[in-house]
Amino acid sequence: MAPGEKIKAKIKKNLPVTGPQAPTIKELMRWYCLNTNTHGCRRIVVSRGRLRRLLWIGFTLTAVALILWQCALLVFSFYTVSVSIKVHFRKLDFPAVTICNINPYKYSTVRHLLADLEQETREALKSLYGFPESRKRREAESWNSVSEGKQPRFSHRIPLLIFDQDEKGKARDFFTGRKRKVGGSIIHKASNVMHIESKQVVGFQLCSNDTSDCATYTFSSGINAIQEWYKLHYMNIMAQVPLEKKINMSYSAEELLVTCFFDGVSCDARNFTLFHHPMHGNCYTFNNRENETILSTSMGGSEYGLQVILYINEEEYNPFLVSSTGAKVIIHRQDEYPFVEDVGTEIETAMVTSIGMHLTESFKLSEPYSQCTEDGSDVPIRNIYNAAYSLQICLHSCFQTKMVEKCGCAQYSQPLPPAANYCNYQQHPNWMYCYYQLHRAFVQEELGCQSVCKEACSFKEWTLTTSLAQWPSVVSEKWLLPVLTWDQGRQVNKKLNKTDLAKLLIFYKDLNQRSIMESPANSIEMLLSNFGGQLGLWMSCSVVCVIEIIEVFFIDFFSIIARRQWQKAKEWWAWKQAPPCPEAPRSPQGQDNPALDIDDDLPTFNSALHLPPALGTQVPGTPPPKYNTLRLERAFSNQLTDTQMLDEL
């Protein structure tokens, strides 16, 4: 064997070998754990203590198991070639449909309550436009006989006035023709009726109890002014009528509904639920929540929805309260209050109205992502409607509550709060002035309702597409109207004509439901994923690395600091408890030594002779070391001599 190979073999025999050439598996594993980039294996080896080592073994094995599981799923999904097909037919719940006649009460049943008001209204129209007293001479004579000998009490309470733009601060009374001074604020309301430009405007004046604070409301159209004036008195009169009596004065379900079909199956008045609205009378809701089951449909199209024929009965319309004929329909959820006056769709007579629906569901995230509310429990406004929370319900409830607080009574067109009454002249003489002032503050967002009320986080909305067609046709009119008259029987005492009827179709255009759902842009999973990506990209860190950092910098670091502080505390306590040691006498040192006490100026030769001798310094008690003992003995001198002698031999 060559000398170099012998030396290498001897080194391998005597020195431990690590790394891939380690002689044992244990040494190989130890080398791998100390030099690998996988943090868990290294922490198993370098960790001190059995508990920490077991924890790191558990973390590492768990991470390995998760990696194997996820990789197995990826491999299985990659090599899977089978497909699955799911075919299912879904049904959509049909919404609740509320139908109201535009005319709230039959004119023949409320005429005796409104006789004086209507007579003064006709007089005002005659004074302003030369309007005839009535459509029929006989009716005019009967109204005149009723009001004969009576003073106009409605115009006396709220006078109708004509304002001339040339005369500021003055107005002419409708009935007396006298001019009067008008003070206070003047509020002009825009007209929705076309009119000829004129220098005169029509309005009325509302004052508080002491008549010192007044507000004048003017309209560019006399028709709007008279209708608004009539509506105020109408609400005051009807607020004093009991609810049961008002239900009897309005239309019954048998009178309003002539025919009914849903999803191709016949239905009748028993499938509708009564809902009394203060301004629209008796309304009827189809597929209400009071039904045992909510109806649904599995097909789209007009043949699979709701089809009804409505009897409008135009002759029973109040000529001053409403100026159009037809019905109103609103589509809503089963637990939602139908705001007919806000979002109702009008149905024309002698026409078929087709309404195609498309459902959209919206789901919003609550705080901190938005200011919506789940059920209204976090809104400090009491819900006076017997329905689920919505933004409209909150706004109307807030206004009605403010009305009761400031005016002492409730507005007629909204539900009553607990322990409140509707406004009327007898108990609340100035409620109209208070109502108008409060409504103006509400529109200008001065009551705080808009800032308190929140939107609902989840709601359903039906997008409507409306189309019209003439109904019945000229050809079918000859046989259809007699048949419908016969079907009505005793409900109708006359032959029906096309202007008394309206047909309504409500259906889903298709069964495609659109859902709008909000999701947080940065969820906790996304946050952890982004953190992991940044740590892995820039520092090659993993979850195990993060745990290692937590162990070193948050556990070991603070434990070392705590241990040092504890050691210092123990030393301080031991020093505190130890008896005090006697102090050794101080030897004069430094400037305390009198021998070093010199003047600021350098001494001269003569002055140095007079200085006192220096005090003897203390001699140290320990003798100086013997340096001879530090000399090195040549222990191998004899051995070296022997070696030299052997060489000489």
Curated annotation (Swiss-Prot):
Residues annotated as transmembrane: 56-76, 542-562
GO cellular component terms, A-Z: apical plasma membrane; external side of plasma membrane; extracellular exosome; nucleoplasm; plasma membrane; sodium channel complex
Known partners and oligomeric status: Component of the heterotrimeric epithelial sodium channel (ENaC) composed of an alpha/SCNN1A, a beta/SCNN1B and a gamma/SCNN1G subunit. An additional delta/SCNN1D subunit can replace the alpha/SCNN1A subunit to form an alternative channel with specific properties. Interacts with WWP1 (via WW domains). Interacts with WWP2 (via WW domains); inhibits the channel. Interacts with the full-length immature form of PCSK9 (pro-PCSK9); inhibits ENaC by promoting its proteasomal degradation.
Region annotation (Gating release of inhibition by proteolysis (GRIP)) ranges: 135-221
Family listed: Belongs to the amiloride-sensitive sodium channel (TC 1.A.6) family. SCNN1G subfamily.
Keyword Phosphoprotein applies: yes
Effect of G183S: In a patient with bronchiectasis
Protein's UniProt name: Epithelial sodium channel subunit gamma
Chain's role: This is one of the three pore-forming subunits of the heterotrimeric epithelial sodium channel (ENaC), a critical regulator of sodium balance and fluid homeostasis. ENaC operates in epithelial tissues, where it mediates the electrodiffusion of sodium ions from extracellular fluid through the apical membrane of cells, with water following osmotically. It plays a key role in maintaining sodium homeostasis through electrogenic sodium reabsorption in the kidneys. Additionally, ENaC is essential for airway surface liquid homeostasis, which is crucial for proper mucus clearance.
PROSITE patterns per record: ASC
Motif interval(s): PY motif: 623-627
Membrane topology summary: Multi-pass membrane protein
